[in-house]
Amino acid sequence: MIPRPTPTESGTTTPGAPVTAESSTTVRIRPDVAALPAYVPGARPDAASPVEIAKLSSNELPFPPQDSVVEAITRAAAGANRYPEMTGETLTQALARRWGVEVEQVVVGNGSVALIQHLLDAVCQPGDEVVIPWRSFEAYPICVAVAGARAVRVPLTRDARHDVPAMLAAITPRTRVVMACTPNNPTGTILTAGELAELVAGVPRHVVVLVDEAYLDFVTDPEAGDALTLLAGAPNLVVSRTFSKAHALAGMRVGYLICEPGLAAAIRSVSTPFGVNLPAQAAAATALGQAQLARTAERSAAIAAERDRVVDALRTQGWEVPEAQGNFFWLGVGAETTALAEHFRTAGILVRPFAGEGVRVSIGTTSDNERALAAAAAWRAAH
């Protein structure tokens, strides 16, 4: 029988369960695909819940898209009988202007996860290795496995940060990509400018360095690194960013990579044609207007200030919270993770548990955050 993933208590999956009658397929699946863990999204509210639910499980912005962006989506949807630009030329040009790079260096796609998958597909062969920090974004090892490579997980430091020397030490002749996430999802910690420079400089030039900066807009630490500042001197560097977080466009699915033109062309060659739909392209391009960017910066600053307030309150309650620089915070409670997530759920708050490791809680509205703080205080009082 073909092994299939089975659910675990945390909602993640483990390989090894055989296909059952309920699987309904007699098709021979690639063994490595059959063994993949399923990506687990943040929990969604139950419409039948008797209490008001605060969804703090997916790192979404609590604000809707800006009015001008919604209007652009509506206008574009009226032309949905036509295909969009195949590689998002208009959006690509706008991004190149925004970041001061060449158009040929920009690749847009259906969210940053899809682009990370395309990058790995372009450079990895079966048996190759990809070095990743761990715990980090849940999709990384899945993308690596789909590309036929092997994820080499380098544990975070005790303060939930990337261990740059250990990541560099993990590089072997089979390494094709070294991945970093700053701020790191789910722990919220950053790579400083010095650490980022050390990482990029220490990776051989034939190995790709992928830096995922999905949450960069929320960073307030002046020591934080910015991968784009290293791009000119590092032809193997790829910077990943998204419109899902600060731009409030998670439902549109638009991300982009910036790298040297030859690698960008290779990534496009394995990407799905017309991969970003027409309304999504229009939304993202509009979000890059000067007025829209200014409003996004204001919103991001407000989220960061609220994050700092919440983290300070949690520490006052007695929680150990790592440096938080995204729009979320991390409670590394280990074996108590499942119980803490259930405690929050009972209080009407959906969070993202990682069984045996900790709970990630997104920053929501002030009201939602106050409810989360009250639930956290109640847990501390009982434990």
Question: Which residue ranges define each predicted feature?
Answer:
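Active-site pre-lysine segment of PLP-dependent enzymes
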Residues: 145, 162-173, 186-209, 213-246
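N-terminal "arm"/small-domain region of PLP-dependent enzymes with the aminotransferase-like
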Residues: 2-82, 383
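Conserved beta-loop-alpha segment that forms the PLP phosphate-binding cup at the N-terminus of a helix
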Residues: 89, 103-127, 255
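Conserved PLP-binding catalytic core of the aspartate aminotransferase-like
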Residues: 303-304, 308, 312-347, 363
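PLP-dependent aminotransferase class I/II
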Residues: 236-315, 319-322
